[in-house]
Amino acid sequence: MATNPLSILFVASEVEGLIKSGGLADVAKALPEALVNLQHDARIAIPAYTAIPDVCDDEVILDTHLETWPHTHYQVKKRFLGDNPVYLIACGHYFDRPSMYAENNQAYTDNGERFAFFSAACLDMLPKIGFQPDIVHANDWHTGLVPFLLKHRYGQDPFFAQTKSILSIHNAVFKGVFHYDEMQCLPEFHCRNVPDAAVSSTHMTMLKAGVMNADKINAVSPTYAEELKTELGSHGMAWEFQQRAGDLVGILNGCDYSAWHPDTDSYLPINYKATKQSMVRGKNGCKRALQEQVGLPIKDVAMFGMVCRLTHQKGVHYLLPVLTEFLKLDVQLVLVGTGDPLLAAQLRDVAAQFGEKFVFVEAYNNQLAHLVEAASDFFLMPSEFEPCGLNQIYSMAYGSLPIVRGVGGLKDSVCDYDVNPETATGFVFYEPTAQALLITMQRALLLYAQNLTELRRVQLYAMERDFCWNKAAEQYVELYRSALK
C-alpha cells in the first residue's frame, strides 16, 4: 500500500516558467516536476494573472461561481508545464492587473481578499473537475487559508474525507495580516473570533490559519524548522510553531541543475566539468570574462562574488562596515543587486573609491548572475536569516566556495573548512557581526594565497555535492504519507 502513487495539488501564488518574483516559484516548478519523476500525479494551481504570457489562450475546463462571494464568477484554465498539469484560476476582478502583488512598490489593498478567493476557489474547483487529491500542498501566507478551509468548510464533505493538507513555510516574515473586515467574503470570519487565525481582536493572519490547521507543516530546511520555534526565527509566531512542533519538519530545497550547471550553462563563455583541468580552465576563462564585462583589471586574483537583494536579511549591513578594510587586500569583488537605496548609495561610494577592486552592479541581470557564480573563487552570503537559500548550492555546483552565516539552510548545506577540511564545501561564521564576516573572508583568502592546490581540491569536492530535487521529493513523499496515516 505504501508504494501506491499519490495525487497532489500543489497550490502556490507563482511558478517558474509562467510567472515569478522569488524562490517560491522555483520550488513550485521543481518539486511537482520531481514528484512526477517519482511516478506521482502532481498538479499545480496558481492564479491566472494577466501578466502570464498567453493566459487568454489557455483551455477553459470549468466556468463556475463561488458561493457566498460577491465577485463570484471564475474560470479554471488548464495548460501543462512539462508533464505537470497547471490549473489557472481566472477571475478578472482579482487577477486582471499588471502585477502579482503590488504596483509602484505599493501592495494591492485587497491582497487579503484576492488570495482568500484563490484559496477558496482551489478547493471549490476540485469536485467540479473531478480531481480528488490525497494531498493539497499549500505554500506561505498566500495559500494559508487552504488548510483552514479544508478543515472548517470541507471537513464533513465526503469528497474531501481522505484529503490531507501540507503547508510549506518559505519565509515566515510575511504572514498575510489583514483586518477581519477584509475577510467578510468568508462566512468563517463573520464572527470575528477565530482563535486559530487571530493575531488580535481586529486582525487575522493567513499564515497562522495555515499553521494551526494543516495536517503537517514543513520548513524549507531542517535548521529553519528549529528556528521557527523561536521568537527571533519565527518573527513573532513561536507559540504557534511550538504548538505544532510534532507535525513540523524541515526539508532542504533541491537545486534545478538543468538551469544551474557549469557544464551546460549557456550564459558562460566557457563551460566546464568537475575535473581539475576542466574546472581551472573554465573558471579562469569566466573570471577574465567577468573582469572584462564589469571593467575590472585583468589579473589572476582572488575573486569574491555576491548576488542578492539589498536588504537587511541578506546581510549587506555586515559587509559594509568592513568592506574598505577588506578591499585593501589583494582581492576583487563584484556585487550584483538592487533594493534598499541607502545600502546602494553606500556601495556606490565604496566602488568609486576602490574602482580597481570593487564593482557594484545595481541591477539584476540573469546572465551576470550566472557569470559571477562561475568566475568567483568565493561567494558571499552573510545572511541575517536564510530559510533555505539557493545561491550557496549554485555556488558549490560552480566551484565557488560559499562564505555563509550559519543560519537556516546555509547551516544545513555548507560545511566549514576549519571544522573538517576533508568534507568542507565553504566557510561558515555564526556571530552576527561585521568583524566575524571579515575574519571568515580572510580565512578564505589565506587558503587561496597559501595553498592553491588545496583550494582546487575543495572546489572540486564542492562541485560533486548533489542537491538534486529528486532527493528532496522523496522526503516530501514521506511527509505526505505520514499525513495520510
UniProtKB/Swiss-Prot annotation:
GO BP terms, alphabetized: glycogen biosynthetic process
Keywords: Glycogen biosynthesis, Glycosyltransferase, Transferase
Enzyme Commission no: 2.4.1.21
Lyase listed as a keyword: no
Residues reported in the UniProt entry to bind ADP-alpha-D-glucose: 20
Gene Ontology MF terms in the entry: alpha-1,4-glucan glucosyltransferase (ADP-glucose donor) activity; alpha-1,4-glucan glucosyltransferase (UDP-glucose donor) activity
Domain of life: Bacteria
Record InterPro entries: Glyco_trans_1, GS/SS, Starch_synth_cat_dom
Pathway stated in the Swiss-Prot or TrEMBL entry: Glycan biosynthesis; glycogen biosynthesis
UniProt catalytic activity: [(1->4)-alpha-D-glucosyl](n) + ADP-alpha-D-glucose = [(1->4)-alpha-D-glucosyl](n+1) + ADP + H(+)
Family annotation (Gene3D superfamilies): Glycogen Phosphorylase B (3.40.50.2000)
A GO CC annotation given for this chain: cytosol
Cystines in this chain: none
NCBIfam families per UniProt: glgA (TIGR02095), PRK00654.2-2 (NF001903), PRK00654.2-5 (NF001906)
HAMAP family, sorted: Glycogen_synth (MF_00484)
Family statement drawn from the similarity comment of this UniProt entry: Belongs to the glycosyltransferase 1 family. Bacterial/plant glycogen synthase subfamily.
Function: Synthesizes alpha-1,4-glucan chains using ADP-glucose.
PANTHER family: ALPHA AMYLASE DOMAIN-CONTAINING PROTEIN, GRANULE-BOUND STARCH SYNTHASE 1, CHLOROPLASTIC/AMYLOPLASTIC
Protein's name in the database: Glycogen synthase
Source organism of this protein record: Vibrio vulnificus (strain CMCP6)
